[in-house]
């Protein structure tokens, strides 16, 4: 019988924590503006899984294209530190709900969609 798909959710960090969140993981490189660390209630902040500063600046610059951003971010996720952090989150997701938290206005777009896809893939 195939394993159940992991329960990976994406929410804005500015939303109040929910009892259904499970493990709360901040997936932004920078701390969210205007949010006290005590209010965030995060369990993990794996900066190795966040887009690099260079990639983030490129994407928000005049030449940034979403498809190319996704490709470059996927490349970054194959780095050893990122791969180790992905494996850790996959393990947590196998045990229960993992909620990825971002300050982005549209939490289902941007790097979180790439990260959800990477976390949902089984390791070969």
Question: Where do the model's predicted regions map?
Answer:
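Residues lining hydrophobic/aromatic ligand-binding pockets adjacent to catalytic sites
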Residues: 1-124
């Amino acid at each position: 019988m195939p394993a159940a798909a992991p329960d990976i959710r994406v929410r804005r960090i500015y939303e109040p924590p929910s009892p259904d969140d499970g493990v709360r993981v901040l997936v932004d490189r920078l701390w969210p503006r205007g949010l006290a660390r005590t209010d965030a209630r995060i369990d993990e902040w794996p900066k190795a899984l966040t887009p690099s500063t260079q990639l983030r600046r490129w994407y928000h610059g005049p030449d940034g294209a979403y498809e190319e951003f996704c490709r470059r971010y996927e490349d970054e996720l194959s780095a050893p530190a990122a791969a180790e952090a992905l494996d850790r989150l996959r393990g947590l997701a196998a045990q229960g709900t993992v909620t990825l938290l971002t300050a982005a206005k549209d939490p289902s777009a941007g790097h979180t969609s790439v990260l959800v896809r990477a976390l949902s893939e089984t390791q070969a």
